[in-house]
Amino acid sequence: SEIFIAGLLKEIPADVKYIVVSEAGASIYSASKLAAEEFPEFDVMQRSAVSIARRLQDPLAELIKIDPKGIGVGQYQHDMKQARLDEALGGVVEDCVNAVGVDVNTASYSLLSYISGINLASAKNIVKYREENGEFTYRAQLLKVPRIGAKAYEQAAGFLRVPGGKEILDNTGVHPESYEATEKLLALFGYTRDDVRNGNLKELRGKVTKAGSAKVCEQLG
């Protein structure tokens, strides 16, 4: 297939390129209950094709829909106790999702369910709330979602992003509890919210290191 496509592109005058995407686990997804739920009118081949294409757009969001064992994590994975393997692989997926964070306005419930403090039921409620009320414009709106209480919100807030929302810090990894300290840190080094919005904080870490982390913490109280 790759040789055919490469040869075909040579005959096209426009600047067209191709990208190779791993199809590992795509057949597992295409035959899953989730795939049938997402694409009820598609056959398994079409679902598989969509899954592979989506991996190019957002790899993490798509790969979490597949049992990690189906992706192939080593030739000896079946020699381990399956319960222990599931726990280990699930932990890695959860760590990855929380390290990256997710857009609360576009994430599927399957992706949201990996966020700390959110289970499958509350993840589905977030999607339902979003469909009925429109996009979230700030993190605290999550408290209006059924099954998202104060404790769950506290655990999840820092991992959920709200691009284009009313509060620029809602689109960062900063937890709401640390917003005040963040404001002080920005002001201390001459930055503003616009710098956060425009991604002009590349030198901030170096400035903090130069000033001394302990001293900066003392100044911030």
Task: Describe these PLM feature segments.
Residues 99-221:
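Accessory alpha-helical DNA-binding modules that contact the DNA backbone or grooves
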Residues 1-90:
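Phosphate- and other anionic-substrate recognition elements at nucleic-acid/protein interfaces
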Residues 58-129:
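Charge-patterned, long linear interaction tracts outside catalytic cores
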Residues 36-39, 79-93, 155-161, 210-219:
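Short, charged low-complexity intrinsically disordered segments located at boundaries
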